[in-house]
Amino acid sequence: MTDEAIASAKSDIESTTDLLERALKLSGLITSLFAERGFKLVVVGGSAVEFYTEGGYMSGDIDFCRKTLNAIPPRVMQEIVAKLGGKGVARSWLVCGLYVDMLGVLETESTKPNRELETPYGTISIIPPELALVERVLFA
C-alpha cells in the first residue's frame, strides 16, 4: 500500500465517528499492512465479540494475534505503526483514536474456520464466535 493510500485511509478512519465502523476500518488497514510484510493477523478477544455483536458489546480496543509461529520483529511493528501515526511501545499502541494490542501467536486447537470480513481497507479474519464467547467467559 502506498504512503498516499495509507494517509487517505488514516484520514477516513479518523473522521469516522461511529466507533464500530472506525474499529472495523482500522482492523482492515492494519491487517493489510501486516499481510504485506508476510504476517497474517486474526482479530481475537473482546474486539471479536464487538464485531460479532455489531457494537452491542464494546471492548474499547482491537486485539490481534498472529497465525504463524514466527514472531513479528519489533522493528516491523514500529514501522507499520509509525506509518499510521500511532503512539505506544512494545505491542500496544494508540492509533486513530483506538487502542491496538498485538497479543502474540493464536493459540487454539479449534477446527472451526475463522470468519472473513471485508472492510474498505482489507479483509479481516476473526476467530469463530464460539471461541470469542468462551474466551470472554474464561477471562471475565
Annotate each language-model stretch with its function:
Residues M1-A140:
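Compositionally biased terminal segments of proteins
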